[in-house]
A protein has these predicted regions:
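N-terminal presequence-like segments and the immediate start of the first folded domain
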Residues: 1-72, 78-124
Length: 124
């Protein structure tokens, strides 16, 4: 089974892609940025973007019947690797125990400071 999903109330995609794709019991969440889902506004503050990005992921996961505890893998992209410790502290707010596997990469992105995608497992 493969199903592309758009979640009502989630931030609009910045391109031609689904919020997530469900394949069997795996949920592949597309890369999310820190845009406010109601206004599309993007804060210029790193911490605000990180929190909003993780909230956007949480909204998508809840829309398909998962939560942050169901995430098994995260890929994080930061424009400024020197902010890793700050990123990590905020990340721990959303994954306080048994965090998923994670890769964090420094890269250049137009206009956003952080992007995160993830894979979650649908509850049985």
């Amino acid at each position: 089974m493969r199903k592309a999903v758009m979640v009502e109330g989630a931030a609009k995609p910045g391109g031609h892609y689904s919020h997530a794709v469900i394949a069997d019991r795996l949920v592949f969440v597309a890369g999310q940025a820190g845009a406010d889902p109601l206004t599309g506004a993007l804060s210029d503050k790193f911490a605000d973007q990180v929190r909003q990005t993780l909230k956007n992921i949480q909204t998508i996961l809840r829309g398909v019947g998962c939560d942050m505890k169901d995430v098994v893998k995260v890929n994080s992209y930061l424009t400024d690797g020197s902010r890793f410790q700050e990123y990590n502290a905020i990340y721990k707010e959303f994954f306080p125990t048994e965090p998923p596997a994670r890769t964090t990469i420094g890269c250049q992105m137009g206009g956003i400071l952080v992007e995160i995608d993830c894979i979650a497992l649908l509850p049985s």
